[in-house]
Amino acid sequence: MAKQVIDIMPTKGMTAAQSNEHLRKYSEGAYQNMRSNNFDPTRAHLGFEVTKGGKIVPIDVNRSIPERMKENLAARGIKDPNEGLAEPMYRTIANIILGGSREQMRRLAFGNQDVNFNIGADNSHIIREKGIEEWAKDTYDFIARKFGEENILAFVVHLDETNPHVHCTIMPINSKNKFSWNQILGGQRDAGKKKFQELHDEFAEVNKKYGLDRGDNIHETGAKHRTTEEYKQWLWGECNRLEKEADGKRMVICMLDEEISRAEIKIKGLTTMINNLNEKKNNLLKEVDSLEQQYRNGTITIEEMNNKQKR
């Protein structure tokens, strides 16, 4: 049976680049550069967001996740513990990836349509199936019940990669409106392991009707006593996580390259401006020297020299 996948990564806030990756806010050039990294821009339009109340909407690229976080906290009167710090210290964001075995997730997303997953293929004719929307809404409801709907900053479904999945961004805020990673998601070693096991168990109940069985996780399988199939499943999860991490870093590099190009253009413009000003200054100095020489030679009066300098 197909397996479910859950991966949770803590971060001390979120950068604009990370937000752009989650929300698919890319320039056309950046998206095209990612074709070789399991991204298909011709399927970008299939992605969607699940928002409050379980509503399916297009991905809102106009409000970044850091902006959403700031607005959310301000409305609730909660202070970001990393605000004002030279370097962020507190884990205020949980990035959760939810999905399952590739073939089953593709069936939910695309049904029996003939999707070409080769790099450079044109899949603009593909439509999104209702199955992935129903799974996403049930998964959103599960996360909302588990962590509080008010703590969900983004719940984005990506259908432009090799394996359809959810990127969910939540804040670990407790019932007292305080950030507490340990209370919500972590704790000491055994406590953290137990919470993750419970999360897997509860998510498996949601996934039953979608043909996804409870998956194994690193905390439970460890490095020993794995069957070949368990080891393959663990490797798939690790490869998927590392693939996403690498893609994120490539995206950051791509964006930095664009910023460097813009900066180089600005520097070139400023250099030209400085050169022009220096040339003008030198011409004026030459003109002053010429006027002073004419005055010393008696060809012009002091008044004439001053008047010409004023011009």
Regions found by a protein language model. Name each.
Residues 1-311:
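N-terminal nicking endonuclease/strand-transfer module with a His-rich metal-binding environment
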